[in-house]
From Swiss-Prot:
Protein's gene: RPL6
Protein name: Large ribosomal subunit protein eL6
A GO cellular component entry from the record: cytosolic large ribosomal subunit
Provenance organism: Mesembryanthemum crystallinum
UniProt keyword terms in alphabetical order: Ribonucleoprotein, Ribosomal protein
A single MF term (Gene Ontology): RNA binding
Residue intervals passing through the bilayer: none
Family statement drawn from the similarity comment of this UniProt entry: Belongs to the eukaryotic ribosomal protein eL6 family.
Length: 234
């Protein structure tokens, strides 16, 4: 920031002899400052500048009726959704290591980034049991291993594909209230099973073409005694 300009102290042209008493009289200073010349130019009157006109603001009329109860006005939401930036180390086909959750330590293949910012990954399921699922990029480690996924079609997969259908809960009657609740088992639709098989078939063709890649994806990642995570090269 630029340094603030220091204002110079005002120095009077009439030096003080004693505090409050100047060297020159009032009439002497009138001629010394040349005020007589300013008056002469303006017909014997000091010039006056017209005051600046204030900006005309629209007058807001007060409300005719005041509400009985004070109601807080909701704040305007000015937040604009921004697409989540993908890490430079994560590209389509990169093998990732999941760090948390049900499949912690599993190696998966990254397929694409969804509109929500989550990553679409799969094991594939036939190799290590990880199905098509969404993962936050904060909970994965990107490795230097790549898989060719040019033959995999992932256009139909989006966030709606993984959404759960909202089911309305029916109110229980008096007789059903005392009955033991039966837990409903969620059955995976056949359509999703077929989608998983189609992705697995395309991925396995690319994986089997690289030696030891299938065994690498099937092995679970773990740290042993003496291993330093910050010194590992993935």
């Amino acid at each position: 920031m630029a340094a603030a300009k220091q204002r110079k102290p005002h120095v009077s042209r009439n030096p003080e002899l004693v505090r409050g008493i100047g060297k020159y009289s009032r009439s002497k200073m009138y001629h010394k400052r040349g005020l007589w010349a300013i008056k002469a130019k303006n017909g014997g009157v000091f010039p006056k500048h017209a005051p600046k006109s204030a900006d005309s603001k629209a007058v807001e009329k007060p409300p005719k009726f005041y509400p009985a109860d004070d109601v807080k006005k909701p704040l305007i939401n000015k937040r604009k959704p921004k697409p989540t930036k993908l890490r430079a180390s994560i590209t389509p086909g990169t093998v990732l290591i999941i760090l948390a959750g049900r499949f912690k330590g599993k190696r998966v293949v990254f397929l694409k980034q969804l509109s929500s910012g989550l990553l679409l990954v799969t094991g594939p399921f036939k190799v290590n049991g990880v199905p098509l699922r969404r993962v936050n990029q904060a909970y994965v480690i990107a490795t230097s291993t790549k898989v060719d996924i040019s033959g995999v079609n992932v256009e139909k997969f989006d966030d709606k594909y993984f959404g759960k259908k909202a089911e309305k809960k029916n109110k229980k009657g008096e007789g059903e209230f005392f009955e033991a609740e039966k837990k409903e088992v969620n059955v995976l639709p056949q359509e999703k099973k077929d989608d998983q098989k189609a992705v697995d078939v395309a991925l396995l063709k690319a994986i089997e073409g690289v030696p030891e890649l299938k065994a690498y994806l099937g092995a679970r990642f773990s740290l042993k005694a003496g291993m330093k995570p910050h010194e590992l090269v993935f």
